[in-house]
Amino acid sequence: MTLVMSPDSSYGRYDAPTPTDVTSPVHREREPELHIEFDGTTVLCRVCGDKASGFHYGVHSCEGCKGFFRRSIQQKIQYRPCTKNQQCSILRINRNRCQYCRLKKCIAVGMSRDAVRFGRVPKREKARILAAMQQSSTSRAHEQAAAAELDDAPRLLARVVRAHLDTCEFTRDRVAAMRARARDCPTYSQPTLACPLNPAPELQSEKEFSQRFAHVIRGVIDFAGLIPGFQLLTQDDKFTLLKSGLFDALFVRLICMFDAPLNSIICLNGQLMKRDSIQSGANARFLVDSTFKFAERMNSMNLTDAEIGLFCAIVLITPDRPGLRNVELVERMHTRLKACLQTVIAQNRPDRPGFLRELMDTLPDLRTLSTLHTEKLVVFRTEHKELLRQQMWSEEEAVSWVDSGADELARSPIGSVSSSESGEAVGDCGTPLLAATLAGRRRLDSRGSVDEEALGVAHLAHNGLTVTPVRQPPRYRKLDSPTDSGIESGNEKHERIVGTGSGCSSPRSSLEEHNEDRRPPVSADDMPVLKRVLQAPPLYGGTPSLMDEAYRRHKKFRALRRDTGEAEARTVRPTPSPQPQHPHPANPAHPAHSPRPQRASLSSTHSVLAKSLMEGPRMTPEQLKRTDIIQQYMRRGESSAPAEGCPLRAGGLLTCYRGASPAPQPVLALQVDVTDAPLNLSKKSPSPPRTYMPQMLEA
């Protein structure tokens, strides 16, 4: 039945097409893949396999599955769980038996409530559906043609034999000519690895060997592609078959290169390789012996080119390879190829009916050799990578050793061991590492001059390679001296100043003077930047040194110092002080009678501290009340006792005035200005002696 899709058809409900360009490659890449099942030219339902009526809820489905899914999501029906492990097959004839598994399959194939589309069917969607249908019909036609070709045994036999002859270079006639030429003019190769077909990689480059062997491997891959039915397999199945059977087919093709009577192998480049010359490391002797034994067994059968081609096809197309998906098609191809081989053997060897079984019995041994060869190849790759890594490390260590040795001789903070080696020149070698390894390091004799010809021209020959080292100007390092601190002061002169020699001069110092005489004059441009700056004249004017500028006070401390200095100058001036009404006894410690020293006081250097000390004592209200009580008792005592008998006045700590509270004298200033007494940083005024308090209270 033909499916007709017209713009007015009720084939689904779709969104309007977007304005995106359909022909753009980016749009083609972003288009989702269509999951469409066909029965000839009819689109089938993704759920039950019935004829699809349109695109419903995101998939192509029939009317029955569309209605079932709509009822389930609209009414939110909870179906009874399946009693058959939830794996019921949903078909057209039994889709109503298990509703639970039917809804589960609807969701699994992609049906969704949000996938409903409205509008007409887009032209792009129609084109995609038609293309998928055409591709499906084309692939089905190819499968039918391949099936017909597999069923046609003579045609299959002819195609396989022709493919073998076109892709294999080592047929019986060609190998016979190579063997005759090798026996007449034998050219033996050097000892090589355990791989039987490795043509002396020590004498030829790896690139040449890879190119020569890659051509043979490519022939096996092309041969597999020409086998009827191989192109119908998926890419994964093709890769699985080639990966597991490539060495087997390659070994069957090259089995005629082994010469068992002479215990030799004809390599791909035509050279002969003796069996004893193969290296037997890493248990390779067992692999070599097994390979020669299997080759002798296969060569004794005298297979023809047609039999070898069919046997190679059977080795490649094997249904028991792990990872195959389309096992049925592979098994079908294997059966047809085996039947063709039986036909050829029956024609060539009618007297040996069991020859096919004998040939098929070699397959387990062939797979064993393939496994051994793969293991040996893995070991070889690991050892080869490790060897290359060690060579790279050794080269890097050699280069770093040469560089570190040159740097250590050029600038060693400890100095050399002997004085004779300290004056040698360290030159940069511009030759490759090979020249440095072959020539070694040359040292100059410090007691004599260096031969210019020996330094300038030095040729090194190795395997026809001539290396000429490039001469570079030698570098001299400064010798260690007991008085050398390692820091340049910037006052050194470019010209060497000759002075009187030291009485305890050593050979080292003489060598140093000799080297300094030979040192070329250094221009100002070659000097370090710091050295040029230190030798330049100062940029600021005046005689003050750089340290004075560095330790100059901040501007806020300068202003405060200026204010305190003026106040101190006014205080230092000698002014007549008025005599009090009640003169006290002479007290040299009183600030009013003791002249200030003419030198700079502490206030000039500690302005903030002096200001805080010159302020009056700050007392709490309780202390002020207590002071008033004491002053009242003192006034009462003045009327009864003479002024000279007052112990407080005699102590010079308090001065009482009539009719007013006494003003405190600058006792703190006295304590600050006295040079002999220690500096008192307390802001509180000293309390009167406790011995006078009872007398004051009694008065």
From Swiss-Prot:
**Skewed-composition ranges (Pro residues):** 575-588
Among its keywords, does the record have Iron? Answer: no
Compositional bias (Basic and acidic residues): 510-520, 561-571
Tell me the Gene Ontology biological-process terms attached to this UniProt entry: cell differentiation; hormone-mediated signaling pathway; negative regulation of transcription by RNA polymerase II; positive regulation of transcription by RNA polymerase II
An example Gene Ontology molecular-function term: RNA polymerase II cis-regulatory region sequence-specific DNA binding
Per UniProt, the NR C4-type Zn-finger stretches lie at 45-65, 82-106
Q: Which InterPro entries match?
A: NHR-like_dom_sf (IPR035500), Nucl_hrmn_rcpt_lig-bd (IPR000536), Nuclear_hormone_rcpt_NR1 (IPR050234), Nuclear_hrmn_rcpt (IPR001723), ThyrH_rcpt (IPR001728), Znf_hrmn_rcpt (IPR001628), Znf_NHR/GATA (IPR013088)
Q: Name one GO cellular component term.
A: nucleus
Q: Name one Pfam family in it.
A: Hormone_recep
What is the protein's major site of localization?
nucleus
The UniProt record lists the NR LBD domain at 152-399
Point out the DNA-binding stretch(es): 42-118
Q: Region (Disordered) spans which residues? A: 1-31, 466-528, 561-607, 679-699
Q: Where in the cell is it found?
A: Nucleus
Keywords of this entry: DNA-binding, Metal-binding, Nucleus, Receptor, Transcription, Transcription regulation, Zinc, Zinc-finger
Which family would the database say this protein is a member of? Belongs to the nuclear hormone receptor family. NR1 subfamily.
Function of the molecule: Implicated in the regulation of ecdysone-triggered gene hierarchies. Probably plays a key role in mediating the regulation of the larval molt by 20-OH-ecdysone.
Return the PANTHER family for the record: ECDYSONE-INDUCED PROTEIN 75B, ISOFORM B, NUCLEAR HORMONE RECEPTOR
Q: What is this protein called?
A: Ecdysone-inducible protein E75
